[in-house]
């Protein structure tokens, strides 16, 4: 049975983990790093993912970053005449993660637990599941990031009853969850968050400040220059990280742009105090969901035993200070904020596989679910923070006489009016027998599975006719689209592999041409001109094949040249052997001649007494 890997598919970075010997371990990427940038780039038809893609982002406009912010929307990005959905871009990242996880584990990986922000709605969860499918992964479970973090943190503390608050500030999303841990049960009590707030926003306030200051000095708006913007983004991210450890940092961007007088440079000192001032609104925005999570759980800050930080942005000192002030305690530093979510996902994979025993995870739905009823209001069937999986049903009736069909408008959100909430889907129940309004009995049932994905059913209790829908938002992908993307992803994987093989073959051919020249030079007059000529012409044929780009020809000509070079080397070896034998023969003769000069002598023993 293949292992289930745990993937934290992040906005800025992603991480993958697997259970090994009863413990979750992080799988390093090919560069040896424990997290990989969630960046995809396209260059001359080739796809680049992770570190490589991020490194060349400044010079390559065909680079996609922070795609997670667009999951579950109809956003598309156009690269080299082709449009990509967020699901496809995420699938490219997942394919990359899957490939290096397979190299590490040593076997094919087909199943995964993928984490999402707790505040992801149904469309965003479905999009994540689709991305996994396109990448060739069966997504066994979608779990909330704060829940995964609590699982990784609390797995060795099962005997202690604790109420913990998980503060998760990632690259593009923010969540707070409160969990009760005890006797191996992890129960989410409440969750709150903001899907449009994260580390990227902290970078942006630094970028805006740099643009503003530069404009003041030079009357040039750097935000209109694409390459300058990418350099500013990298500098802002670095400054943000530096200011977590030092109180001020130098930002230096030479040749950022050119003015009438020539090239211009950006030089600036950024203090931690200035950064705190610029980002104070963002920090305060994280406090509102924190208070909401506490009030939803009917808890006060004194009821919280531990505060766990998740996400790289929680390293910002102002964030830690705000948490300490709000909750009256220092957050726990016992877990790595970049890795803890992936570790928790791997533990959940272990639970599903049966490797981790006596652990029960009770998650909640982050938003209320209901339908639109008369007067365009939302009637809730499942309240937010309800433990999942769950189901609920309610009976409704018709709004007009002789109404033969009802439209079921499925909604997710906390607002009273239907138009203010998120539409998850619509479907129709038809063939209702004509009757006065209020007479027909229509039962509407909601089911939420463990992944947080919703099924809705409407049934006419009079005729037992029913209609159901698995919610896929208007921005979601149809099964046909997912299948097409799966096929494309597989083809791309094959194409990438073929491209890699071509590069390897070209490198081997170039190396062989170099070796041939060296061998011919070393042999000099030790082999016949005819043999040398054969090798030279085989080498020229290989060069021509390389220029033509026909890989079949390159392979054939490479094999032919290898044969010639081996023959030349063999002749050289024979010659060296002959010379060695000849030399040892001459040495033998010489020593024989030396023996002829030896004088035989008789020895007689001399007695000491005779000498006297």
Curated annotation (Swiss-Prot):
SUPFAM superfamilies: Actin-like ATPase domain, Heat shock protein 70kD (HSP70), C-terminal subdomain, Heat shock protein 70kD (HSP70), peptide-binding domain. GO terms for molecular function: ATP binding; ATP-dependent protein folding chaperone; unfolded protein binding. Keywords: ATP-binding, Chaperone, Nucleotide-binding, Phosphoprotein, Stress response. Transmembrane segments: none annotated. Residues 524-544 have a biased composition (Basic and acidic residues). The modification Phosphothreonine is found at residue 173. InterPro entries: ATPase_NBD (IPR043129), Chaperone_DnaK (IPR012725), Heat_shock_70_CS (IPR018181), HSP70_C_sf (IPR029048), HSP70_peptide-bd_sf (IPR029047), Hsp_70_fam (IPR013126). Induction: By stress conditions e.g. heat shock. Gene3D superfamilies: 1.20.1270.10, 3.30.420.40, Actin, Chain A, domain 4, Substrate Binding Domain Of DNAk, Chain A, domain 1. Residues 587-612 have a biased composition (Acidic residues). PROSITE patterns: HSP70_1, HSP70_2, HSP70_3. Residues 574-586 have a biased composition (Low complexity). Residues 524-560, 572-612 are annotated as: Disordered. Acts as a chaperone. Belongs to the heat shock protein 70 family. PANTHER family: HEAT SHOCK PROTEIN 70KDA. This is Chaperone protein DnaK. The gene is dnaK.
